[in-house]
Amino acid sequence: IFSILMDTDCILYLENGEVFSGFSFGFEGEVLGEIVFNTSMTGYQEILTDPSYHSQVVLMTYPQIGNYGINNEDNESGSCYAKGLIVRENCKYPSNFESKESLDSYLKKNKVVGISGIDTRKLARIIRGDGAQKCIITKENNLKKIKEKIKKFPVMKGNDLTFKATCKDIYNILGDKNEKKVFVYDFGCKHNILKILSEKFKLNLIVGPCDTPPEEVKKINPDGILLS
């Protein structure tokens, strides 16, 4: 571990024992989570705010991430759900007319730990072969301590994250007053799904928490029910 850290400042350690050295960016700290990968060339802002990535460490396989910054339009929810971000190269100076801040700044603000300088293609092949597994991004250089932290960290399987991703109260999204009314059970629903239903299909949406009682939905008397 000491030799691996010689020219870098943090490591990514996988549950299977694989070690990758890199450079920290975003929030300064340590993060444990389930590692998953995404092959999209763009859309990192949508991915970070997608409730389906709750408590996961996301690996982006595209070589450069952050080149168009962060804007006010592309969030898929009201929160940043990913716990960590792994990239080959973090673009420090984004260029886009809609950009409001850099990826680095956004991660700091939302307490998301990032690591760059990683061979992301190699890492993706490992995950593809071995499946999702626990990982840690850390500046710790004691391998024994790292292994203990990984071992103690709970597995994602069977962990109910729905209540952490759902909305707190019922709210309405108006489409066309002449169109049908749909009740949406929010199990971590993305904003874009609601946007398409209301703007493209003109549906009137009533979005409720995942534990909304059936009796409450019956009072609303919707034309349809969507589980999302």
Model segments located where?
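Short glycine/threonine-rich loop/turn motifs
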Residues: L226-S228
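RNA-binding accessory domains that recognize and position tRNA/RNA substrates
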Residues: L5-K200, L205-I220
